[in-house]
Amino acid sequence: MSETEVPQNNIILASLDDLINWGRANSLWPMFFGLSCCFVEMMTSFTSRYDVSRFGAEVLRGTPREADLMVIAGTVFKKMAPSILRLYEQMAEPKWVISMGSCANSGGMYDVYSVVQGVNQIIPVDVHVPGCPPRPEAFLQGLMLLQEKIRREERPARKVLHLAGGSEGTTRPVLVDGVTKSRDTRGPGMEGIAIRGTSVQHPHFPMPRSDEMWRPPAPKHQFPDFGLAGELETAFGHRVVRDDHATDMLTYRCPPELLPDVLRHLKTRSAAPFRRLEDVACVDESCRRERSRFPDFTVNYHLLNFHIPGHLRIKAELRGDTPEIPSATSVFPAADWYEREAFDMYGIQFAGHPNLRRILMPPDWEGHPLRKNHPFRATEMHPYTTDDARRHQALPASDFFDRIDEETLILNLGPQHPGTHGIIRFVLKLDGEEIVDMDTDIGYHHRGAEKIGERQHWNQFIPYTDRIDYLAGVQNNLAYVNSVERLCGITVPDRGIAIRVMLAELFRIANHLVWLGTFAADVGAMTPVFYTFTDREKIFDIVEMVTGGRMHPSWFRIGGVADDLPEGWDGAVKAFLDWMPGRLKEYEDLLKGNPIFRERLKGVGVITGDEALEWGITGPNLRACGVEWDLRKKIPYNGYQHFHFEVPTEEGGDCWARYRVRIEEIRQSLHIVRQCWKEMPAGRWITDDYRYVLPKKRDALHDIESLIHHFINATRGMAPPKGENYSAIEAPKGENGYFVVSDGLNVPYRVRIKTPSFPHIQALPLMSRGWLVADFLAIIGSIDFVLADLDR
């Protein structure tokens, strides 16, 4: 019988359709692929509490050619989109796609220049799973919806038998932004309604009344002067002058041409040397309200002193559309990536920089995103399409090295690889299996968080901080609100401080548990990851009881926390404190005495204490080099000076030392949480300075002043005094700092985010040269980095 003679409603073909669909629906082969926060919740569904194996989809496939299901779990970045399309096209037919999370579905809260507004603009999608991020249960529901779609809608028998007609796999169209899908961030049907609100447009209106309101100046904090006044005058005369307007740290203004000499003096000749370059923070001053007081650009070099704990800021003022300043890389090697970022984001030229090229944006990107005249939103730009994804390809690996010998092998590890812990591209130059040199291509997870900070009011930005280090939860909130509170002079009540500390330390434990499980898997131990995710769920039960959220509670507020602790919190915390010490011993029994685990780590990826200081390494990775430095002790914040705990250190500077430090940090965090549980103060959980927070309802109902503040804060948001503040916290991965700049409005003028992952990955070649590729996976796993923390 010919193809045309086969009846459409053939009972044999229909039965065969049912049989094939039954097999395919119950044996989906998902690819090991993740983009951001949503992927962590997707992976949680593979653990014992949720058990995705019930649906026949528990084995993640390492390559697209072995997979038939692609889960787009997280934000789709324009730099990553070409790789997503390539992976999809390499999958064998039939194949299906689940879009998991608001960002994958539509761009979500990231309507920003670097993000594709929905993965269905480059590949077709079968099922959309809502949420930011979706819970594991939501992913399982999405999986069941896909199974139902396969069973009900597909007719594969004709395709299998090479007959005409039938259908299998994804058949839905790829959409075009603004043509076959809405470009309005609020969804379809809203095109005729004007966009309103500070969350969707820059809130500059002609002569708003709030601009005329008097505000007290930013309070001046106490900070060391390091004895620099006479020292700098002797060395540089009156060309380097103190900035008396600075309220957060000692600040000097320096002519651009003197910058390397000033930095070299501070690092090597000062009586109290500044050993570490903390950050390079640039500001485009072109939209200041008092424009005449400011240059076109300001470059801020933040330095750290270990002898007299404190920070120092060196400001250099630049003018013109193509400003230039000497590079600081000859003084601080860590300046390399920071200056490349400033060039990428602002177009500032650093004379003498050894490799000044883009670092976050694609190599063919037009413009500099953090300039005030660059578009904010993806929906203000040309729609991103499949053609764009095919046209904008990554640099070839050979472009990363000056010279490649005939016998040299170049290996691309990433941007999609199960061992890289996210979307990042390591380019390895090999002699056999030994790493001779390497370079790193980052920016595949760049979500434009700093640009977004310039269009949200001060409280609106808090949810975005959750998604920087998406494994650290409220630790991100704490870093941000701490800087804003210092700028405003806000005092947080004791109960609010204790609640913050308790939750921050619970998230430190949760972070280290995820790190421990995935790191053990990197070196061949599969059991710990299932144990650690189970214990992480116990922490999330507490977090959900207190905040209502899991990964991203967004629960800290400027001035305190969102609400008081609920009834029963103490019992839940006590149960966890009783459980976890024994569990930690079990982990050590599994790993510490394991000879394979030990040999894979001992002596591998060594970095010395001096090298760590030189390259800006912080947190557990610094303490694993024998340097006892923890901001909670050295520059206390949020009441940590009132808690008793030890700072664990190790001397090896290798993967083993990094493992040992984090295990001991879990113990110390448990000790801090126990103190919070035992000694939780009574009273308010948020400040009563209603200029900056919403008043309690009873105060707003009985006091006109409180009611006025309620109205102002609810309608336009609070407005800090003019000024700037940089402060950092001891986050789980290292030091996380926010440099916030206020022009006296209800939105930040500039939000600079200093993360630990950025300098740690920059220093990776130092730890990796001379080791094998297999050791390299252990080294990057031992560092503990997150791509959103790296790329922001």
Curated annotation (Swiss-Prot):
It is an enzyme of class 7 (translocase). Residues 230-385 are annotated as: NADH dehydrogenase I subunit C. GO terms for molecular function: 4 iron, 4 sulfur cluster binding; iron ion binding; NAD binding; NADH dehydrogenase (ubiquinone) activity; NADH:ubiquinone reductase (non-electrogenic) activity; quinone binding. It is found in: Cell inner membrane. Pfam families: Complex1_30kDa (PF00329), Complex1_49kDa (PF00346), Oxidored_q6 (PF01058). InterPro entries: NADH_DH_suC, NADH_Q_OxRdtase_suD, NADH_quin_OxRdtase_su_C/D-like, NADH_UbQ_OxRdtase-like_20kDa, NADH_UbQ_OxRdtase_30kDa_su, NADH_UbQ_OxRdtase_49kDa_CS, NADH_UbQ_OxRdtase_CS, NADH_UQ_OxRdtase_20Kd_su. It is a peripheral membrane protein. Residues 1-156 are annotated as: NADH dehydrogenase I subunit B. It catalyses: a quinone + NADH + 5 H(+)(in) = a quinol + NAD(+) + 4 H(+)(out). Its main location: membrane. Gene3D superfamilies: 3.40.50.12280, Cytochrome-c3 Hydrogenase, chain B (1.10.645.10), NADH:ubiquinone oxidoreductase, 30kDa subunit (3.30.460.80). Residues 412-792 are annotated as: NADH dehydrogenase I subunit D. Keywords: Cell inner membrane, Cell membrane, Membrane, Multifunctional enzyme, NAD, Quinone, Translocase, Transport, Ubiquinone. The keyword Iron does not apply. Its EC number is 7.1.1.-. The keyword Membrane applies. GO terms for cellular component: plasma membrane. It comes from the Bacteria. NDH-1 shuttles electrons from NADH, via FMN and iron-sulfur (Fe-S) centers, to quinones in the respiratory chain. The immediate electron acceptor for the enzyme in this species is believed to be ubiquinone. Couples the redox reaction to proton translocation (for every two electrons transferred, four hydrogen ions are translocated across the cytoplasmic membrane), and thus conserves the redox energy in a proton gradient. PANTHER family: NADH-QUINONE OXIDOREDUCTASE SUBUNIT C_D (PTHR11993:SF45), NADH-UBIQUINONE OXIDOREDUCTASE 49 KDA SUBUNIT (PTHR11993). In the N-terminal section; belongs to the complex I 20 kDa subunit family. In the central section; belongs to the complex I 30 kDa subunit family. NDH-1 is composed of about 13 different subunits. Subunits NuoBCD, E, F, and G constitute the peripheral sector of the complex. This is NADH-quinone oxidoreductase subunit B/C/D. The gene is nuoBCD.
